[in-house]
Amino acid sequence: MVFRIASSPYTHNQRQTSRIMLLVLIAALPGIAAQTWFFGWGTLFQIVLAAITALVAEAIVLRLRKQSVASHLQDYSALLTGLLLAVSIPPLAPWWMVVLGTGFAIIIAKQLYGGLGQNPFNPAMIGYVVLLISFPVQMTSWLPPYEIAATTPDMLDTLRMIFTGHTASGGDMTLLRIGIDGISQATPLDTFKTSLRAGHSVEQIMQYPIYSGALAGVGWQWVNLAWLVGGVFLLWQKAIRWHIPVSFLLTLALCAALGWLFSPATLASPQLHLLSGATMLGAFFILTDPVTASTTNRGRLIFGALAGVLVWLIRSFGGYPDGVAFAVLLANITVPLIDYYTRPRVYGHRKG
């Protein structure tokens, strides 16, 4: 009688990487639709630019490394990296910025480390942070949602803005950022932080048009809820586990609630933190990256909680209005340590 000895792992998941990546791309559709609805065609154009750049950059590096281009491109990881970066930057950012950021994400943050599965940091967030540090003005120049915008560019004007910086009538970014109150608009988090520094009270800030009739900023709450819908879809499909998004959101909400309770005149409310900025995008689509996140269940809870604390600290006391990207990268640094101390005991062995 012949006995076959198989090596671990003894349980297998039949889902391939390409299928998981495709599920994430599908889950991103509600968020993309919401951002396009509130901020215009620029979101779609940036996604197309980022996707093309990601595929070309990946193909070039794979060819230089003498690896199969077709098989690697078919895992959709490059497309997902480009998409996550594209939806994180302002919709009318110059074309060369998304090309530069995506190229850096693919070539430096991913392929330089050996490709998919080898990178210690989330490539899309590396690209985003490089752009934010290098071009802070352009990276914080978000359009006001169409509901409070004085001027809304059409599809052709959006293309002109991205590639030339001007509309057909000669308008520029400064003009397009003006709201119905005649004041240049920013994101709810940016407006909150800037206004506090200018000496305005929270009560005064909440009267601004960007917060009018909204829990966390006109348009932005619906964008976050749309990303939440996509996240629930990923949980339903078991493409991601619940530990990271739940621990992240609960920790962020708890920190925000405690801060708001003790200092309501200087700190943002929990709903502003949860439904503004890149909160839901980060919780379900960025932090859950299986390559750069913790691999144990306890580790995932710690990883998500750490990111939640960091986001709140950066938003409340840091120099940037939204801290999701920095929090993700800082949490990525701790993953080896978290995994070391949370790895499960080998069956049949006692702790030494």
Curated annotation (Swiss-Prot):
Mind telling me which NCBIfam families this protein's record contains?
PRK00816.1, rnfD
Topological type in the membrane = Multi-pass membrane protein
Where is it located? Cell inner membrane
Q: What is this protein called?
A: Ion-translocating oxidoreductase complex subunit D
Q: What's the source species for this entry?
A: Salmonella typhimurium (strain LT2 / SGSC1412 / ATCC 700720)
Function, in words: Part of a membrane-bound complex that couples electron transfer with translocation of ions across the membrane. Required to maintain the reduced state of SoxR.
Q: Which UniProt keywords apply?
A: Cell inner membrane, Cell membrane, Electron transport, Flavoprotein, FMN, Membrane, Phosphoprotein, Translocase, Transmembrane, Transmembrane helix, Transport
Tell me which domain of life the UniProt entry assigns to the organism this sequence originates from. Answer: Bacteria
Record family assignment:
Belongs to the NqrB/RnfD family.
What is the gene name? rsxD
Cofactor entry: FMN
